[in-house]
Amino acid sequence: MSASHKKPTPTELASDAHKNRRVVNTVNRPTRNTPYHDRTEAGECLAQEILLALSGGGPATSPGHRLKGTSPLARREPVVVLGLCRGGVPVARTVARLLRVPFDFLVVRKLASEANPELAIGALAECGRTDSGRDVGKKEVPQKRLRSDARRGQKPGEPAQESGLPPDLERTFGVIEVLNRDILAHLPDAEAALTSARDRETEELRRRVMRYRAGKAPERLEGRRVILVDDGAATGATMRAAIASARKQGAAEVIVALPVAPEEVCGELRHEADKVICPWTPAFFMSVGSHYTHFPQIEDEEICEVIQRQE
């Protein structure tokens, strides 16, 4: 038998099977089927799955165990974990703490009509600049379903309006928009509904950016491996906006990490992210909160407290 056709040893086969199983589990087949106690436990679970998926199936840490020394993820290339506001922030903070990598947040808002607040017609995400200083939130995005809109009421090509943000934050602030055109196509008076939702949510997004960032610019994403974390996803609308924002800011790789989401949503996100890590894809998905034992509403004060502790 030639060297090129050498039969693999049982140890090699087992190792390959383990690696393949773990990577598939974190994306396709769930490794969990019981509710999380809270967002902290969800973050602990995600930290283990992320480490397994991105470090070639190496040994996992036990729940709550913090890695010693430099994270194996950070040793390979620059990594940053971004929590989607508001529910994803405590989950992401736990992930970043356990993996010993930088943490930041991303303000996102769902776009919905006032007639049906649960129906996502799109989403917004804050979008800053690349390290080269290139503006990333004020131009048309050449991707399907994406359109950027840096200021309330601003149309593509129009001069930027004043945002009311502090000067340091103003230089990095923009908004990127993702639309669900399939839903908009069947929505009565869609343009009016979209305009109303866009104005309303852009104003709220700006308010949250001012409150949470307190005048400080966000982490630079250009050339970095970006891990986007939320506490779950029902439609994936805000996560798609987050992916678009990270891409536009020059992320080298975009990884989505969710504790729980429908398999259909994970499948859609796989077309836009480089990797999707989701340990629980229940067959019957009611809501994100129904898959937690303790799932309180996250208030502004809690977000600010998490951010201050990070500093």
Predicted regions and their residues:
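PRPP-associated nucleotide enzymes
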Residues: 2-311
